[in-house]
């Protein structure tokens, strides 16, 4: 649980930083005056609305002009506010004489959705009618990622057991990450099995549904609740067919086939007892595989006669051969350097014998140090200064 609590605390701290510049009482004053504040983003990506409040520099204001950074509250909004690991919608709010470009949406206090952005042109005023529209392509990419996270979560729990419960996530356009408790690195065979299982279910094109119900009903249905998340009496259950059921307030695709492809990229540690899987979904996953295919083709062309499945062994053999050649070359250079050094006559300076020499060949620092130590041991009361050049750099020992 320690790792899970750390992830939750990090998410809370990040959200607190995004609202630190505004006194919460300013938000509450807008919320108290608003007649209704409604999120319609599950069903719509654009809608008519009206501005219920504007904040600039952390203070409520009646209007804002081009160039102003503002926070706006609307009566009705299709914009999804960041939460549950899902990044916020981007888009625009257009008024009669002005337009705001929205690049962040937050809920600084429960029930209040705040849209943040810059007034790109004209002027906006409190109370005026506006048209709000989200970036549909971004939303679709994020929704794919969120549904993919649910499916990857379920697959890990099936394979590793119930301890592999989500301890954090981020759903971005075309990519996602998934954190979960684990005592050590997850074997590659498990990652391959998760990927195979999830993509197999994409082919089945399972229906993805979202249903509101009570917590009791959700538990009877077997829906998964995440540690550290807060739920009301009524909850929203997102189901991928009959396979994965999870309490979630995020946006999702309509069918699993819309994900196209899920590709797990990496698995790593992000803290004591917590592992992170990063992945791509949809077009981003296909682009990644296309790049990998081009790289593979290039390697097979470089290594004549090699089949793709033979590349790891062939490259490993080549690396070992190169290392052996480097060792032999180092031995040869050391022997050649020693012979060249034998021709150098020490210069007596008082009781000290000075041996200073610049080699005619390129020698690295290790070889120079070895030669210097051997020479110093051979000649008593000696000071040895050796130099060479290597890749246009002066090397001293």
Predicted regions located by residue number:
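A glycine- and charged-residue-rich anion-binding loop/surface
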Residues: 3-397
